[in-house]
Every structure is written in structure tokens, then in C-alpha cells.
């Protein structure tokens, strides 16, 4: 027989002779290495092989020795300790089995050595000795592992390595000859050798199924291993079998968090945060690559292998079609190509899954690292009064919800670097082998294609940046409006605010559509040009070169051109992604590198250090402008362990002084000092409370000491309040303490500062929201108690009289300057005291009241339901097609949706017809050499042009419909949220709502429509593949149905698990945003208490919970992929086998069928994956729909309209009114009867919880009316449209809210009034006389209409905000005014001025004032006294005083007296 080594290899990919020395050469990419395969077992090549085997075995032994020496030097035998798991028994059993196999292998090798029974390839003595040495080493390693426990892992790894080195030569020896038609019979191998081969294979596969040993990364955490860490390598890297329990659980019931595998310790947040801090560089891009280089390297290697394996299928297709065209000329067994059609997709899938596994691991790790760094930056940053930081709440939310996800997509950068060049270059090389120089024609057009996204890249970057800015703007506005939703509802501003959000949403959508159109044009162009490149190549090949196009050439070329088209499509997509990635990296990097941070605190103990300022000047911003407020030339030293008070007029800088001492201001010159070694506690002017229980807010993560806790509760006057709560101190208070009154919030914040074991306590006007009784109680039982002994207390207050005797040091602040008052007889103090509230209050001795059981015993309170915030609802069950059609209905009319679907069908049908036409053309070329190629080329080109046009129309019509759907869904949810009851916001954290408008809307905008598009395409590809192949090979329907059923089964299991996990991800994302927003608002308090580490840990734990679910979600994708890939990979092989056995099929039909079979097999997995991703993204659609169907406040009706002049006068009547906050809630106001005459000034007084605020809310219809009627100007309020009612009543809350913008936009947010009127309102309220800052020459800068307002008015003092709220009420010119202690935070001089303004500006208006300071309402027309929801007294204050009732006792406690009225009597209720 002819020597096969010098036999020409004839085919599409190899030309010439191949030397025998070339063995598996990667340089011959076209598998010409097959030419070295011998046709018989006894070919000379096998006799030349022993040296190759010998060197391999000897090299393996050397590597093994080096490995063992390295492990010994690194003390692996003595330091490492393994941790047991539930698989320990299985691990031991596998170890014993491997030991037995090593004995058997040694015995068989020794037997062959003695009896000279080695095969020819192993008969050389050196090789025999090496193999025997290997057997001895294997036996020794397994034996040592049985008796030497500390070294077991190292020895085990060495044995596995040794086993693995044996497999290639032995496997090659047995499989080598069967690659050829004339292979030797199986009987030529003895059973002994087959058994030898078998135990070699088993010895290598057992380690794959052996559970692994776990080494804890953080032994101190007492952390249990994740299933991912102890399962076998096969379950970990191949089958993902450790997720089987989760998948089976999801089949039976709804998935819970505890059903998912715990997060591995190497993926915990603290591990990656530590690495980031250690490897941090100024460039975030470089830092990311330094930290995650292993994942990036793994992605690069696996991506390269995917590219290489991709070519196995087209090579096999070419050779199989070549065999069918000329069976006699083929020497290679055609079953080899069938096997290659199976192994090609299998290997591609294996490396693809490994690539995806590494990339999703990078995704999860980069997410947890960057999000934690953003939060850490938030904790360090200055937010208050920073103009550049107005939007930091929304900006931080957007960085986490958008930019961090975009940075995670940097993994796709590997695609352009590795995979695209390899596949494009490989395809061009193989096309050149197939089509000669005509392939370079296509290459030229391909280069042109490549330039399109590069040229348009800057434009895409610009459009992307503009769209992102629009998204930021919308999210920032939404965050601000949701933070102040109650003031919006108080004023009836829902509809105008809706319009503002919708305008920003429209800008965002317009910019997004421009970007989308650009992407569509690039995508269609990039996908179409490779197709026309293929057309041009065929034209040159057939007409100019005069070659005949055969099925093996045509369909292989189509596959290769599809590779090029796919890669350039990816390039077009990734060019936009890369632009977005670098934009996001820049945004996150700018945020993290922002130098505006507070100074690190000094915790060094130094008792000699003084507390105060030393020639210090400070501002809120790092680079102040002339108009910015400044504390100037401060020289103040506060005495240690004494009480100091800070006084001054409203807006003078008192709160800034305290913030400066805490390090919240930027130091421009001088120095300041606040020792932190023994801790600092701080009570802000606006109390900051966490969304937690009362007890958690007071403890603030300090240990619970029962005795001290009881004393603090008693000292802060909280006993009565706790008795009124259902679960006492275990009652949840909601976001920002929304369920509490202003006084209750202030006292809880005070209790937190008093309970903490700190030596320094800073308090900012803690008495502003307290009534006289409570103020005096706290002064007596808190400030003068043992709780405050040996503590340095610095208190900002207007109650000078209360602390005059006990204060050791007094500081006066005026216009940013401060100086001490050394003489208590100073005229300044005299004036302050005269202006202060009248006198101390004699309160009942609450000390005699025992602390109730709820405070004594936490267990008793646990039995009661103190929960306020409802858990986020989860939609359960599978997402059905009705929901998908429900989403598509938002595209437009039914006709429009039908037209879009028709474009999908016709585009897919055209694609199939193109391949069918190629089959018809190539068959004609084979049967008739003189075929008219021009006719076929013309039809072929026309079809390609039609396909490109249909593709464009399909994409544009679909994306436009999705754009409309996004707009409608956003607006529907927006209107629903703004139209729901105010009580819903008490139960729903703002972060949860923001998450719906940020992450879920983004999902609908970007992901949902894309996955639906992809799912429809995949479905049509599957259906088209089945119909196409079955039409030529009907028997193919059987395996196709089996594959579809198997795909459906695995897809069903997978989808139920994945959708459940995705829904959990959505739920566990909201707490991250909630804690972020909560921390930004209270960051100064967190820093003052030095609780940054605790809050970082809380955030880290929430991140770990989220990453646990995200990793499970990613790995579930791998779970289904390996199963569906394994099944669908059989399809191509089965189709090839059918074609081989079915002799009557022409090569063209076979090529068409195999091409469609490959498309079908790949589309099955893609369809399962896309359906899952679609269902997961539909979760966002469900969540948006959920918030679009919230219970709504009554909608406006024609009957509810009122004249523009209504009410002409403020006549108010309550007729037997009883209300509650919900239909099932307790009655708050009980049978209230009263009549308020027009223009009367009525004060509402009573103890905390008596129902004062509820009365005002009832007038605005914020409560549930149980019975009775309320009339305003003779009209029942229930019959008036809600927005009209609230717009005609002005409400001035205790905690005023300002919106970002200017003073003008806050007074007149809808530009309806002239500046003259607005300036008059500023002047009347006194706001225009307030000083914001000073210029460099000390000239004051007053508040004007153009004064900048930061988010929530953070650049104004609390008193200034209350005055601006008064100005806003003046602008509204309402006939009814409700004031809820609106002067609590102003000094008494300003209070008196405001009271005068109220009487003058609202002389003809009816005023309802909820008051704590009795002196401010002594000249009111009437007073109503509420007690536990009952109106107990109502009448003129002098009359009530002399009735000796509730009001008299309150006046006596305040030192207020009234002269006897000339006429007694009152209009009783």
C-alpha cells in the first residue's frame, strides 16, 4: 500500500504534502494534520512514536517533583488545614477507589513489562521503564495520601496530575487508527489491553467527580462553605450540578433566599474591598484590571479556544459534503466528520460556558467592589450646602443602578481583542483556501464595514452621554420629589410636578431614540455588508475566475461569512458598549476621586487638647465664591465636662458652627479641634432617624444595657409615647420617622445621643419641636441628671432662659462671626432672655410613672406587631404569553403590532429562501457545468437586498413600538405613584420606589425589548429549521421533536428557578438604594457618632445578599446551557448521519439541511436562554405594572369643580366628625363638633398624640373619615375635587421642604406670578432681610429670588426654610391657612415678627395654628384643646382660662395669665 505520509491531501482546505514530523500542528489550521494519521495499526509512524511518549512522561515526572518540592517549601504539609463537609464520606470513598485502581494499574503495567506484552508504540525499553515508574509513583502517591493526612491535598493533586499525563498517549494509541476507512478490526486488540485502557480512563474521571476540600478564607467568621466550594470539579465547572436542589425546589414551590447556595467566602464583599483598597490607582480602568486580572486572563484564553473550536463545524461540513460529492476519493472515515459535527459544538459550548462563567464571576465581583466603593465615598463626602452636590442622591443612585452595570460589561472588551480577530482572520484564511483570491474582494468590503462603527463612534459617544445626562436629570428629580412627596400633596401640586417629570422623561426618550436610530443604522449596515461581501466574492469566483461553485464550497463559505457577519455585528454593538463603558468609568472615577471629603477624625487620646476654633475660617464648599456663607475668624474654646450654649438670630450660622466643629465644613485658614478618643454624639436640628424600630434608633448599634436604657427613656420623656405604640419601643417608625410627630422624632434623636457612651455631646436646637412641659422635663431629668455628668455638652438653643443658670459658657453667633459672652448680665443676654419663651413649665412628676412592660421586656413587645414598612411583594408563578402580549399592546394599535410581527416572519422566511436558492444553484452547477451563473447571482443579490430592507424595517418598527411602550409604562406608573394615598409612602421606602423608576424603567428601556426581539427571532429560527430540514429529511422530525421536548423540559425547570431568583434580586436591590439614600441624609450624624464602619458593614451585608442571588442567577444560565447544548449538539451530528445513510439526497440539499440543522441546534439553546432572560426582564414589567395599579385618591370630576374664587371666606364646620388613618385602623378623632368663623385665628393645643396634626390633615382629606361632615364655605369637602381643595388651603409644616432650584422656583414653581409680587412676599415674610453670606469686604448678601436653593434646601438653616415656607404661603393667598408649629426653629425675635406677619398678611384668612408655645397664641380668637382625639374645650383663650379646665392648667404651667373677660361665655363645640 502507498505510504500515507506522502499522499496528497485533496480537499477544500489543504494542498500539497505534509511532513511526518508535523504532529497536531496549529499552524495548519485546516486540519491537514489528518494526513499524518496512518491507515493501519502497524504503520511505521507508530514505531517512530516512543521517543515522543518517553519525553512526555519524563517531563511529567520532572514537573511532578518540582510541584512537590514547591509545596514542601511553602509549608503546605503543615499549615493547610481542611474543613469537612457533607461530602467528606464520598471524598474518602473516591480516594480508596483511586488507590485500588493505582494498585491494579501497577500490577498490569508490571505484568506487561515482564511478559513483553506492550503494544508496538510502547515497546521501546526507555518508554516501558518510564511507564512502570509512572505506575509506581501513582501507587506511592495514593498510598502516602492514605497514611499522611496533612499532605493529602498536595499528594492528591500530584496523583491527579500524574493520571492526567497518562491519558493522552494511551488514548491516542487506541483511537488513532479508526480515523480512516481501512481501519483495523476491533479484534486486533486483546481484552487485556482494552481493560488497561478502561482503568486509565476511569482513573482520570474519578477525580472529576470527587468532592473538593474547602479552605476557609476567613476562619474567624465561622462561615459554612458554599455548595460551589465543596462540590466536585465536574459539578462545579461542567454540569453545575450543585444547583440541582435549587432547580428541583423551584419546580415544587416559590424560591426563597435560603434555597440558593450561600455566597462563597472568596466572593464576599470584604475580600474584594480589601483588594481594591490595596491595589487602588488614580485610574479606575487600571485598578479594575489589576484586581481582576485572573478573571480577564481566563476570559481571554477561553474566548480564544471558543474561536478555534468554532471552525470545527464548517470544516466537518466541508469534508462531509466533499465526501458526498466524491465518495471514492475520500480516505478518511466519514464518521469522523459526523463526530466532529458533534464535538465541535460541544467543545465550543464547553469553552463558551467557561468564558461566561469567568465573565459573570467578574461581573458579580466588580459590582460588589464598585458599589461598596461608591458607598464608602458617600460616607466620606460632603453633601450639605454643596452646589455641585445638589444631585448627589440621584447621582449616587444612578451610578449604582446604571454605571456600575455598564462597567461590568467591560468583559465584552475581551471579545474585540481576542475573539473577533481570530474568527475574522481564520474565516478569511479558510475562505482563501476555498475561493482563492476572490475572497479578498469580500475582505476589502469587510474592512469598509469595520470602519463604519469606528468613524461613527464619537457621534455615538456624544449621543450616549447626552442620553445618560437626561436619565440622571430625571432620576434626580424623581428622588427629590419622592423625598418631599407629602409637601407636594399638601399643596395639591401632583399634576404640575407630574408634568415636570414627564418633560424630563420626554427629553430622555428623544435622546434615546436618536441614539437608537444611530445604532439601528450601524447595526443593519454592519450586518448587511458582510452578506454583500459574500455576494461580491461569489460574483468574482464564478464570473471572473470562471470556477464552479459546489455545495461544499458554497455552504462552507456561507458558514464562514456568517462568522464574519456575526463578529462585525458584535463589533458594532460593542463599539457602542465600549463608549458607554468608558463614559461610565469616567463618571464613577470622577465621583470616587472627588476631593470634597471631610477630614479624617482624630481618635488619639490627648486630655490636654482643647475643644474649639483657633483663628479659623470655614465654608461649606472647598472653593468658596463671594456669595457663599463663611464662618470667619473664630477663636472659641469650649470648656470640658461643662454645658456650653450657642445663641444667635435665625440664619446667623449657629448650626454651621456645630457642623464645623464636627468637620463637615471646609477649613480655609486656622485650625479647629474636637477630640474623638472617647466618642462624640450629635443631635441635628432636623432629627435624622433610621427606617427601623425606636429601640434600634436609640441604641444606634451600641450594646443594650437595660438599666441605662430605662433611664434614658425616662429622662427624654418617651414613656407616655411608648405606651401609645402597639409594640412599644419595637415599633417601626418608617422612613425619616414618618409615623412620629416632630417632638417625638426630636426626643428619640436626643435619646440616641444621651444613651451613647460618649464624652462629648453636640445638640442643635433640640427644643424647637417640644412643648413647654416636655422641654422643662428634659431639662430637669436629662440635662441635670447623672446621664450628663462629666460630659462636654455644646447646645444650640433659643431657650436662653432655660439654661442661663446651668450654662458654664455662652457663645453668641452673628453673621458668621462668633464670640464668647463672659458676663451673664450682658445686655445681649438680657435681650435674648426677654425675647425668649416666657417661663419654665411645671410638669407632673413623670418619674413616679413606672416604665411599662413593653420597655421592661423585649419579648413581650415581640408578640405585638410593630412592623410598619411592608415587605416588597413578589409576583409568583411563570410569566405567561398573555403578559408578553400585554406588553406588546403598548406598542400601538393591533394593526401596528401585526405589521411588526409580519416583518419578523418575512425576514426569517427570506433568510431561509436565500439558503434554499444557494442549494438549488449549487446542485445545478454540479449537474450542469454550463449553468448560467448570472441568473442565479441576480436572484441571489435581489434576495440579499430584500433581506437587508426587511431587516431594517423590522428593527425600526419594533424599536419604535418598544419606545412608545416605555413611554406609556413610565407615565402610567408615575401617575399612579403620585396619585396614591399618602399613607402608602409611609409603608414604602423611597429607595424602593426610586429603584422602580431607575433600574426597572431602564430594564424596560434597554433590556426587555431587546430580549423579546431576540426571543421572537430564535423562535422563528427553531420553527424554520425544523420545517426546512424535515422537508428534505422527514425522519429528522423525530430527533428535532426530542430535542425540542428536552429543551422545553430543561427550560421549564430553569425558567422557574431563574424567574424566582430574578424576582428576589429585584427585591434585594431596593434595600441597597434605601440604605444609600438614608445614609446620605444622615451622613453627618453617622460621622459624628463614628459609625461609618458599622454602616459600611451593613451595606456590605446587603451587597453580599444581592451578589449571592446574582451569582446564582448567572450560574443557572450555565446550568441550562450545558444541558441544552449537550442535547442540541446532537442535532447536527444526527442530520449528518441521516444524510450519510440517505443515499438519494443531493449534496446541495444536504448542505442546505445541515446548515439549517446547525442553525436549529444553536437556536434551541438561544431560545431557551432568551425566553428565560425575557421572563426575568418581564419581572421589571410586572413591577412597573404593580405600581401602575396602586389604590388611587379620588380622581377629579366635573361635579367636583369649584369656582376660582372658592372659598370666598374661610368658614369651616366640623359636624360629628370621626376619622382614622385607614379603614381598619383605630379612631383618632372622635365626634368632633366645631364651627370656625371666617377670618378667625384658632389655635389647636394638646399633648403629643392628642390628634392636633390629624385635625389639619382631616381638613385636607389625608385621613379616612368614619362619620360626619366637614363644610368649607358651605360646601362639603368630600364633594370638592381633591387637588382643588388642597390648592385652596395653605399648609405650613413643621419641617419645611424646599426644592432644588432658586427661591423664585420655590415660591412660584410654575411661573405664574410676576417678580414684583414674589419680592413683596419675601419682604412681608422677612426672608429678604435674612443674610445668606458676606462678600470679601463684609457686605451682607441677602436672600433674593435668584438665590440658589440646594436639594431639600440644605444650604439654608432650618429657620430660614421656615420663613421661606411662610413666604410660599403668602404667595398662594389662600383663605384658609394651617400652621403646624411653623416657627419652632426660629429665634423669638423672628417668631414675634412672623406672628405679626401672619396677622397682617392673612388678616382676612382663617388660620388654624397647631402650637406648642402658648405665648404665641394668647391673642388668637379661639383655642381648641384636644385630648386623646376628643375636643374637650373650644372658645376664646381668656374664657377657657377662667373655666379652670385643661387650658387653664397648661397656662399655669407656662406662667401665662388672662384678665377676666368683660363677658363670659364661649361658642362651645
From Swiss-Prot:
Tell me which residues are glycosylated. Answer: 386, 510, 615, 691, 790, 815, 923, 1007, 1355
Bilayer topology term = Multi-pass membrane protein
Broad class of where this protein is predominantly found:
membrane
Start and end residues of each ABC transporter domain: 611-840, 1214-1453
User: Which residue ranges does the record assign to the ABC transmembrane type-1 domain?
Assistant: 296-580, 897-1176
Which GO terms label this protein's molecular function in UniProt? ABC-type xenobiotic transporter activity; ATP binding; ATP hydrolysis activity; ATPase-coupled transmembrane transporter activity
UniProt xrefs under InterPro entries = AAA+_ATPase, ABC1_TM_dom, ABC1_TM_sf, ABC_transporter-like_ATP-bd, ABC_transporter-like_CS, ABC_transporter_C-like, P-loop_NTPase
Keywords (A to Z) from UniProt: ATP-binding, Detoxification, Glycoprotein, Membrane, Nucleotide-binding, Repeat, Translocase, Transmembrane, Transmembrane helix, Transport, Vacuole
Keyword presence, Transport: yes
Binding of ATP 1, residues? 648-655
Q: Which family does it belong to?
A: Belongs to the ABC transporter superfamily. ABCC family. Conjugate transporter (TC 3.A.1.208) subfamily.
UniProt function note? Involved in detoxification of xenobiotics, and vacuolar sequestration of glutathione S-conjugates. Together with abc2, required for accumulation of a red pigment (ade pigment) in the vacuole of a mutant affected in the adenine biosynthetic pathway.
Give the protein's recorded name. Answer: ATP-binding cassette transporter abc4
Q: What species is this protein from?
A: Schizosaccharomyces pombe (strain 972 / ATCC 24843) (Fission yeast)
Q: Which gene encodes it?
A: abc4
Amino acid at each position: 500500500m502507498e505510504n500515507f505520509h506522502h499522499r496528497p491531501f485533496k480537499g477544500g482546505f489543504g494542498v500539497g504534502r505534509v511532513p511526518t514530523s508535523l504532529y497536531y500542528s496549529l499552524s495548519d489550521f485546516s486540519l491537514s494534520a489528518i494526513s499524518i494519521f496512518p491507515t493501519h495499526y502497524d504503520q511505521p509512524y507508530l514505531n517512530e512514536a516512543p521517543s515522543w511518549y518517553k519525553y512526555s512522561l519524563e517531563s511529567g515526572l520532572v514537573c511532578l517533583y518540582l510541584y512537590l518540592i514547591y509545596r514542601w517549601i511553602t509549608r503546605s504539609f503543615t499549615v493547610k488545614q481542611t474543613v469537612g463537609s457533607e461530602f467528606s464520606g464520598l471524598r474518602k470513598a473516591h480516594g480508596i477507589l483511586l488507590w485500588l485502581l493505582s494498585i491494579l494499574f501497577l500490577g498490569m503495567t508490571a505484568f506487561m513489562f515482564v511478559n513483553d506484552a506492550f503494544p508496538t508504540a510502547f515497546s521501546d525499553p526507555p518508554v516501558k521503564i518510564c511507564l512502570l515508574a509512572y505506575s509506581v509513583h501513582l501507587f506511592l502517591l495514593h498510598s502516602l495520601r492514605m497514611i499522611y493526612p496533612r499532605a493529602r491535598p498536595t499528594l492528591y493533586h500530584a496523583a491527579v496530575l500524574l493520571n492526567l499525563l497518562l491519558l493522552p498517549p494511551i488514548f491516542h494509541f487506541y483511537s488513532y487508527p479508526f480515523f480512516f476507512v481501512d481501519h483495523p478490526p476491533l479484534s486486533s486488540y486483546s481484552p487485556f489491553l482494552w481493560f488497561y485502557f478502561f482503568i486509565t480512563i476511569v482513573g482520570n474521571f474519578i477525580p472529576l467527580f470527587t468532592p473538593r476540600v474547602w479552605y476557609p478564607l476567613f476562619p474567624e467568621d465561622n462561615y459554612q462553605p458554599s455548595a460551589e466550594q465543596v462540590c466536585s470539579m465536574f459539578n462545579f465547572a461542567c454540569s453545575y450540578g450543585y444547583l440541582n436542589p435549587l432547580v428541583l425546589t423551584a419546580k415544587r414551590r416559590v424560591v426563597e433566599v435560603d434555597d440558593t447556595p450561600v455566597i462563597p467566602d472568596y466572593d464576599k464583599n470584604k475580600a474584594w474591598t480589601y483588594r481594591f483598597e490595596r491595589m487602588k490607582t488614580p485610574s479606575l480602568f487600571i485598578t479594575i484590571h489589576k484586581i481582576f486580572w485572573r478573571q480577564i486572563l481566563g476570559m481571554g484564553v477561553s474566548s480564544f479556544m471558543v474561536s478555534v473550536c468554532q471552525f470545527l463545524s464548517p470544516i466537518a461540513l466541508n469534508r462531509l459534503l466533499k465526501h458526498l460529492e466524491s465518495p471514492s476519493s475520500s480516505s478518511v472515515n466519514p464518521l469522523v466528520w459526523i463526530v466532529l459535527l458533534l464535538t465541535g459544538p460541544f467543545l465550543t459550548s464547553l469553552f463558551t460556558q467557561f468564558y461566561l462563567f469567568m465573565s459573570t464571576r467578574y461581573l458579580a465581583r466588580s459590582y460588589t467592589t464598585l458599589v461598596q466603593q461608591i458607598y464608602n465615598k458617600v460616607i466620606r463626602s460632603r453633601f450639605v450646602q454643596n452646589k455641585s452636590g445638589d444631585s448627589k442622591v440621584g447621582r449616587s443612585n444612578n451610578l449604582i443602578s446604571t454605571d456600575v452595570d455598564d462597567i461590568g460589561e467591560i468583559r465584552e472588551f475581551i471579545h474585540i481583542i481576542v475573539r473577533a480577530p481570530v474568527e475574522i482572520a481564520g474565516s478569511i484564511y479558510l475562505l482563501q483556501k476555498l475561493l482563492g483570491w476572490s475572497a479578498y474582494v469580500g475582505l476589502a468590503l469587510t474592512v469598509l464595514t469595520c470602519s463604519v462603527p469606528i468613524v461613527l463612534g464619537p457621534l455615538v459617544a456624544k449621543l450616549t452621554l447626552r442620553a445618560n445626562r437626561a436619565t440622571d436629570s430625571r432620576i434626580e428629580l424623581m428622588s427629590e420629589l419622592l423625598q418631599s412627596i407629602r409637601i407636594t400633596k399638601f399643596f395639591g401640586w401632583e399634576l404640575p410636578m407630574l408634568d415636570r417629570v414627564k418633560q424630563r422623561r420626554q427629553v430622555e426618550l428623544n435622546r434615546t431614540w436618536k441614539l437608537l436610530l444611530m445604532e439601528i443604522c450601524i447595526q443593519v449596515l454592519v450586518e448587511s455588508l458582510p452578506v454583500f461581501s459574500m455576494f461580491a466574492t461569489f460574483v468574482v469566483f464564478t464570473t471572473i475566475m470562471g470556477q464552479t461553485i459546489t455545495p461544499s464550497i458554497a455552504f462552507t463559505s456561507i458558514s464562514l461569512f456568517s462568522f464574519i457577519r456575526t463578529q462585525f455585528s458584535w463589533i458594532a454593538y460593542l463599539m457602542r458598549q465600549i463608549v458607554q463603558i468608558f463614559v461610565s468609568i469616567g463618571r464613577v472615577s470622577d465621583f470616587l476621586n472627588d476631593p470634597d471629603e471631610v477630614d479624617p477624625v482624630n481618635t488619639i487620646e490627648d486630655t490636654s487638647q482643647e475643644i474649639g476654633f483657633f483663628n479659623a475660617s470655614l465654608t461649606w464648599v472647598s472653593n468658596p465664591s463671594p456669595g457663599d456663607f463663611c464662618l470667619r475668624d473664630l477663636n472659641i474654646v469650649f470648656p470640658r465636662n461643662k454645658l456650653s450654649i450657642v445663641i444667635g438670630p435665625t440664619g446667623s450660622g449657629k448650626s454651621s458652627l456645630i457642623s464645623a466643629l464636627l468637620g463637615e465644613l471646609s477649613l480655609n485658614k486656622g485650625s479647629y479641634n474636637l477630640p474623638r478618643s472617647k466618642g462624640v454624639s450629635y443631635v441635628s436640628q432636623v432629627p435624622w432617624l433610621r427606617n427601623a424600630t425606636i429601640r434600634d434608633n436609640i441604641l444606634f448599634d451600641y450594646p443594650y444595657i437595660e438599666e441605662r436604657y430605662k433611664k434614658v427613656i425616662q429622662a427624654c420623656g418617651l414613656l407616655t409615647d411608648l405606651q401609645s405604640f402597639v409594640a412599644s419601643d419595637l415599633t417601626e417608625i418608617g422612613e425619616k420617622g414618618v409615623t412620629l410627630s416632630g417632638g417625638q422624632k426630636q426626643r428619640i434623636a436626643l435619646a440616641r445621643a444621651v444613651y451613647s457612651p460618649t464624652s462629648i455631646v453636640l445638640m442643635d436646637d433640640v427644643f424647637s419641636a417640644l412643648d413647654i412641659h416636655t422641654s422643662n422635663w428634659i431639662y430637669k431629668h436629662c440635662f441635670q441628671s447623672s446621664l450628663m455628668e462629666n460630659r462636654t455638652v455644646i447646645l444650640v438653643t433659643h431657650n436662653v432662659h432655660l439654661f442661663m443658670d446651668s450654662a458654664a459658657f455662652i457663645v453668641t453667633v452673628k453673621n458668621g462671626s462668633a464670640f464668647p459672652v463672659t458676663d451673664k448680665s450682658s445686655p445681649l443676654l438680657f435681650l435674648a432672655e426677654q425675647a425668649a419663651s416666657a417661663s419654665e413649665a411645671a410638669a407632673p412628676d413623670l418619674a413616679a410613672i413606672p416604665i411599662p412592660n413593653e420597655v421592661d421586656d423585649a419579648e413581650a413587645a415581640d408578640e405585638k406587631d410593630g412592623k410598619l414598612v411592608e415587605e416588597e411583594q413578589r409576583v409568583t408563578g411563570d410569566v405567561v404569553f398573555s403578559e408578553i402580549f400585554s406588553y406588546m399592546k403598548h406598542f400601538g394599535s393591533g394593526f401596528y403590532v401585526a405589521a411588526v410581527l409580519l416583518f419578523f416572519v418575512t425576514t426569517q422566511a427570506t433568510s431561509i429562501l436565500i439558503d434554499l436558492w444557494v442549494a438549488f444553484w449549487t446542485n445545478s452547477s454540479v449537474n450542469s457545468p454550463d449553468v448560467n451563473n448570472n441568473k442565479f447571482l441576480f436572484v441571489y443579490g435581489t434576495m440579499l437586498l430584500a433581506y437587508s430592507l426587511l431587516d431594517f424595517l423590522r428593527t425600526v418598527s419594533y424599536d419604535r413600538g418598544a419606545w412608545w411602550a416605555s413611554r406609556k409604562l413610565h407615565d402610567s406608573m408615575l401617575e399612579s405613584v403620585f396619585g396614591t394615598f399618602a399613607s402608602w409612602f409611609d409603608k414604602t421606602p423611597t429607595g424602593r420606589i426610586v429603584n422602580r423608576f431607575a433600574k426597572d424603567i431602564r430594564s424596560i428601556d434597554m433590556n426587555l425589548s431587546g430580549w423579546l426581539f431576540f426571543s421572537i427571532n430564535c423562535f422563528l429560527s427553531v420553527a424554520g429549521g425544523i420545517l426546512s430540514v424535515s422537508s428534505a429529511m422527514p425522519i429528522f422530525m423525530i430527533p428535532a421533536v426530542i430535542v425540542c421536548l428536552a429543551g422545553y423540559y430543561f427550560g421549564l425547570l430553569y425558567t422557574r428557578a431563574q424567574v424566582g431568583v430574578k424576582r428576589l434580586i429585584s427585591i434585594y436591590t431596593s434595600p441597597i438604594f434605601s440604605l444609600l439614600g438614608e445614609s446620605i441624609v444622615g451622613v453627618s450624624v453617622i460621622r459624628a457618632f463614628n459609625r461609618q464602619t458599622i454602616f459600611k458593614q451593613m451595606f456590605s451585608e446587603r451587597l453580599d445578599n444581592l451578589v449571592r442571588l446574582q451569582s446564582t442567577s448567572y450560574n443557572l444560565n450555565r446550568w441550562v446551557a450545558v444541558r441544552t447544548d449537550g442535547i442540541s449538539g446532537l442535532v447536527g451530528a444526527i442530520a449528518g448521519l441521516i444524510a450519510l445513510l440517505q443515499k438519494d439526497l443531493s449534496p446541495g440539499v444536504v448542505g442546505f439541511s445541515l446548515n439549517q440543522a446547525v442553525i436549529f441546534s444553536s437556536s434551541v439553546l438561544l431560545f431557551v436562554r432568551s425566553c428565560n432572560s425575557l421572563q426575568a426582564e418581564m419581572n421589571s414589567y410586572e413591577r412597573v405594572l404593580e405600581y401602575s395599579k396602586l389604590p388611587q385618591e379620588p380622581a377629579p370630576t366635573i361635579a367636583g369643580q369649584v369656582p376660582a374664587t372658592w372659598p370666598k371666606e374661610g368658614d369651616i364646620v366640623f359636624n360629628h366628625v370621626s376619622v382614622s388613618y385607614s379603614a381598619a385602623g383605630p379612631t383618632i378623632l372622635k365626634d368632633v363638633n366645631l364651627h370656625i368663623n371666617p377670618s378667625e385665628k384658632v389655635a389647636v393645643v394638646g399633648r403629643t398624640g392628642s390628634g392636633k396634626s390629624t385635625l389639619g390633615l382631616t381638613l385636607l382629606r389625608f385621613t379616612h373619615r368614619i362619620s360626619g361632615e366637614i363644610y368649607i364655605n358651605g360646601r362639603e369637602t368630600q364633594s370638592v375635587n381633591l387637588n382643588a381643595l388642597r390648592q385652596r388651603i395653605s399648609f405650613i409644616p413643621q419641617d419645611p421642604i424646599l426644592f432644588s432650584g432658586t427661591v423664585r422656583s420655590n415660591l412660584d414653581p410654575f411661573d405664574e406670578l410676576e417678580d414684583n409680587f414674589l419680592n413683596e412676599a419675601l419682604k412681608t415674610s422677612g426672608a429678604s432681610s435674612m443674610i445668606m453670606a458676606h462678600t470679601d469686604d463684609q457686605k451682607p448678601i441677602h436672600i433674593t429670588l435668584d438665590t440658589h436653593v440646594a436639594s431639600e434646601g440644605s444650604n439654608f438653616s432650618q429657620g430660614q426654610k421656615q420663613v421661606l415656607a411662610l413666604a410660599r404661603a403668602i404667595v398662594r393667598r389662600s383663605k384658609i391657612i394651617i400652621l403646624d408649629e411653623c416657627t419652632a426653629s426660629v429665634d423669638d425675635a423672628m417668631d414675634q415678627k412672623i406672628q405679626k406677619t401672619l396677622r397682617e398678611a392673612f388678616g382676612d384668612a382663617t388660620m388654624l395654628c397647631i402650637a406648642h408655645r402658648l405665648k404665641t397664641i394668647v391673642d388668637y380668637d379661639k383655642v381648641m384643646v384636644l385630648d386623646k382625639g376628643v375636643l374637650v374645650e373650644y372658645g376664646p383663650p381668656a374664657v377657657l382660662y377662667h373655666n379652670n379646665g385643661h387650658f387653664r392648667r397648661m397656662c399655669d404651667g407656662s406662667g401665662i395669665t388672662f384678665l377676666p373677660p368683660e363677658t363670659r361665655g364661649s361658642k362651645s363645640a
